[in-house]
Amino acid sequence: MSELEKAVVALIDVFHQYSGREGDKHKLKKSELKELINNELSHFLEEIKEQEVVDKVMETLDSDGDGECDFQEFMAFVAMITTACHEFFEHE
């Protein structure tokens, strides 16, 4: 498997490690999203401690307005982070 294919599998696996702990196994609730960000993105994003920060992140990601983050919305989030990291490292 190529590095990119491994990355795709890893993204799917990480999403499903956190989704469904509290409900729909195909969506992240706010608490699941917070835990995912704090555990899996700690080198790129600050730890989320305040509920209002979680609310704002979810509001930004939740394109269909259901109050949860589905896989497509999660991937849009990953794309935003990846783009920001690319721009940061490009200037170093």
UniProtKB/Swiss-Prot annotation:
Modified residues (N-acetylserine): S2
Occurrences of domain EF-hand (ranges): 13-48, 49-84
Binding site for Ca(2+) 1: S19, E22, D24
Matching SUPFAM superfamilies: EF-hand
GO cellular component terms attached to this protein's record: ciliary basal body; cytoplasm; cytosol; extracellular region; extracellular space; neuronal cell body; nucleoplasm; nucleus
Binding residues for Zn(2+): H16, H26, H86, H91
Keywords: Acetylation, Calcium, Cell adhesion, Cytoplasm, Metal-binding, Nucleus, Repeat, Secreted, Zinc
Record-listed Ca(2+) 2 binding positions: D62, D64, D66, E68, E73
Record GO biological process: adaptive thermogenesis; astrocyte activation; axonogenesis; cell adhesion; learning or memory; memory; negative regulation of monocyte chemotactic protein-1 production; phosphorylation
PROSITE patterns recorded: EF_HAND_1, EF_HAND_2, S100_CABP
Record's subcellular location: Cytoplasm; Nucleus; Secreted
Subunit structure, as described in the record: Dimer of either two alpha chains, or two beta chains, or one alpha and one beta chain. The S100B dimer binds two molecules of STK38. Interacts with CACYBP in a calcium-dependent manner. Interacts with ATAD3A; this interaction probably occurs in the cytosol prior to ATAD3A mitochondrial targeting. Interacts with S100A6. The S100B dimer interacts with two molecules of CAPZA1. Interacts with AGER. Interacts with PPP5C (via TPR repeats); the interaction is calcium-dependent and modulates PPP5C activity. Interacts with TPPP; this interaction inhibits TPPP dimerization.
Job description of the protein: Small zinc- and- and calcium-binding protein that is highly expressed in astrocytes and constitutes one of the most abundant soluble proteins in brain. Weakly binds calcium but binds zinc very tightly-distinct binding sites with different affinities exist for both ions on each monomer. Physiological concentrations of potassium ion antagonize the binding of both divalent cations, especially affecting high-affinity calcium-binding sites. Acts as a neurotrophic factor that promotes astrocytosis and axonal proliferation.
The protein's name in its UniProt record: Protein S100-B
The organism of origin for this protein: Bos taurus (Bovine)
